[in-house]
């Protein structure tokens, strides 16, 4: 299912936030975040892994490298809520907070009144 089709399937519940969590690191989640920013009438959250698991089951994304992604997303006003998932440590979270604490949050889009359907793909009419 595409991200927009998933979004269409949950908007009836009027969530506080729609977000991306786990499965991927910040580099791999970025294109999905940009798409979510484009379509979401709700706050946007993101909680990336500290990269993809390596051969030893660990995560190679450093706090500094994750903070660079988060800072870019914050400066682009893509996010309202940010955190970490698999492999993220207290140091990752500390740096995310530091790079975003003075940035303006993403503004919610105006609600669009039209039919939004979902299957594997979104259909908006």
Set out the residue ranges of the language-model regions.
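Domain-level signal for soluble alpha/beta catalytic cores
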Residues: 1-125
């Amino acid at each position: 299912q595409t991200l927009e089709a998933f979004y269409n399937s949950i908007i009836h519940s009027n969530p506080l936030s729609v977000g991306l969590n786990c499965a991927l690191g910040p580099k791999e989640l970025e294109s999905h975040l940009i798409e979510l920013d484009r379509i979401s009438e709700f706050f946007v959250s993101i909680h990336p892994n500290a990269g993809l698991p390596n051969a030893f089951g660990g995560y190679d994304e450093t706090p500094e490298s994750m903070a660079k992604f988060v800072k870019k997303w914050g400066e682009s006003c893509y996010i309202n809520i940010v955190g970490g998932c698999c492999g993220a440590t207290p140091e990752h979270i500390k740096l995310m907070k530091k790079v975003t604490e003075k940035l303006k949050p993403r503004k919610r889009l105006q609600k669009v009144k039209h039919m939004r359907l979902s299957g594997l793909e979104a259909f908006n009419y």
